[in-house]
Amino acid sequence: MKHEYKFWDWILNMINKQRYGELSWYIDNKEKYLEFKNQEEARAWGIKNYKHWADKYKQVMQMSNMVIKGCMYKKPLECYCGYSYRQINEFLRYDKDNKSHTYRELADILSMVLCSAPRVPQDLVLYRMVNDEFVNRLIENNKNTPPTPIQEKGFMSTSLLKSITNQNEPYAKEKNLLKIFVPKNTIGVYVNAVTSRSEEEMLLFPNMYLGLVSYPYNDKETKKIVFECELIGIYW
């Protein structure tokens, strides 16, 4: 019976290799990555690690009211989380901007804001919903010779909780869920320490890469297809 299971495992592995390519990234010990099970745990962790910084950020932004005219520049993080994330990320991904270079400036300011925050203090699991186009590029890159991680040129919005799939937001309708293994010292911010977000959001620095670490599988709890990825930064 054991030999029969091994045979079918071998067949499944061969099918996955053909469909998704060889796995070139590997997480040595997934158990060491902190993963939250509920909102209370996630929020307690976020407040503990980011509230002091968030208070300083708000104080500085309040002082800037005396000299900065543009309202978006006074609250760059809140502005991003409101409606400007599309335009900011379009600038970073496609170099699209308005004549006043508003979104280039916002992207620069927000990058500095994130750099001023504490680094992620420990290895961490984050989640992100993505569309089929992203998944197709992830697979295509993984099947390259040699395999290459997929780059996210924009800021990366993620959640501390897998229950992001239950949010009443358009992204929750996507069928693909990234489970991201984030290394200690990554540049990122717990957004809820600054502004109220229902999804326990972590916002990560731009120009990150994601490498596929396991073949996708169906998650019974969320009814999503899970793609486990390693976050690869260019600055550490």
Language-model-detected regions and their locations in the chain:
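Active-site and NAD+-binding cores of ADP-ribose-processing enzymes
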Residues: N131, P147, S159-K162, N166-W236
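N-terminal subdomain
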Residues: M1-M156, L160-S163, D219-W236
